[in-house]
Amino acid sequence: MVGEVLHPGSIGIVTVRGNQGVIGGMANGCATYAQNEEEFLDEVTKTLAGRAGVSLIYGVMDIQASADIEQADKLMDIWQCHFAGGGFVGIESGDNRMSEQRLSYNEAIKSAKLEELYRRAYKILHNNKYFLLAVQHGLLEHETLLNSDLAKIRESCI
């Protein structure tokens, strides 16, 4: 749902049907990689949205979202490498790149950015709660929603 809000029309299918041991999921409509830092951080935000949605609807933290958190953590490692997410402060010589100090610095930045993106996902869901609930209702009724179904639901919630 967050993906559809951030990039309308980008979600091809949403389902609650199981596949290869995973219950439910969604597929992006296009198979392109993030072209810039903003798009990349949108991907991390979408990854954290499931956990944020459970918190918003049920008022509890989703302790079963470990796979999502692990994926977000991996994406943040990529962000730090490819988009200089750790900044240039404290960069050490090549001989000392993996020092404890540098790793600790990077983990603190990554943790803060994950927290920021989680709050962003929560805010998007909160601001679009009627859309979220309508998608939830549609999935309960039909089990699978296509891009066209999401567009109709979104139109009805505006």
Regions found by a protein language model. Name each.
Residues 3-158:
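Soluble catalytic regions of large protease machineries
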